Amino acid sequence: MTESHIDFRRAKFLISAPDIAHLDQYLPGDVGVEIAFAGRSNAGKSSALNALTEQKNLARTSKTPGRTQLINVFELDAQRRLVDLPGYGFAQVPLAMKLKWQQSLGEYLQKRACLSGVVVLMDIRHPLKDLDMQMIEWAVASEIPVLALLTKSDKLAQSAKMKTVNEVRKALVEFGDWVQVEPFSALKGTGKPKVLSILNEWCHPQWLADELENQDDAE
């Protein structure tokens, strides 16, 4: 089956849900393909989503880290969705709320069968914090590929940027092909073509092709 090119500019807001249980209620079953975006509250997740979809206000950015507490879902087409998970790890968020978020994130990664890939966004100046590693480990344990996206790469000189990229790749080498590491700048557009290529590949898993083929056969 030849992969079609997904136009990420067509992404549109679908629903918000407070946790994974409610997500199951709102969406039409655990079907199709979902690509999740996860990261610490100051990792630039909303800015990255807006840059990748070329929409200034698709994902709301906030000057207050930790404000995004909902799971926000954006539809690419009838079979494919982008999922913006709550930011994690912000110090001023109450402990009970932190624990609730972490439980929700863990449940989503471990239980969502249609999850085709996870983008873990990290500020390139502060990569691989404990919760970042936990997210990566959860995803790989569930056999979900990960893109470790080092955001705000425009904040570093080229030599420092590549040094950090290589250090992160070395730190994650134990996960093999399950984890890719790329630099990204929402401001400058650095890394955007590579990221879109990876997302496009994740939008075409073999099981979705089989699912659509079975639907055609049934008709």
UniProtKB/Swiss-Prot annotation:
Q: Which UniProt keywords apply?
A: Cell cycle, Cell division, GTP-binding, Magnesium, Metal-binding, Nucleotide-binding, Septation
Q: Does the keyword Nucleotide-binding apply?
A: yes
**CDD domains the record matches:** YihA_EngB
Which Pfam families does the UniProt record give? MMR_HSR1
Example GO biological process term? division septum assembly
Q: Where does GTP bind?
A: 39-46, 66-70, 84-87, 151-154, 184-186
Gene Ontology cellular component list: cytosol
Name the positions where Mg(2+) binds: 46, 68
Q: Which cofactor does it need?
A: Mg(2+)
Q: Name one GO molecular function term.
A: GTP binding
Query: Which cysteine pairs make disulfide bonds?
Result: none
Domain annotation EngB-type G: ranges: 31-205
HAMAP family cross-referenced by the UniProt entry: GTPase_EngB
Query: Briefly, what is this protein's role?
Result: Necessary for normal cell division and for the maintenance of normal septation.
The UniProt entry, under NCBIfam families, shows: GTPase_YsxC
Similarity remark: Belongs to the TRAFAC class TrmE-Era-EngA-EngB-Septin-like GTPase superfamily. EngB GTPase family.
What is the name of this protein? Probable GTP-binding protein EngB
The organism named in the record is Shewanella sp. (strain ANA-3)
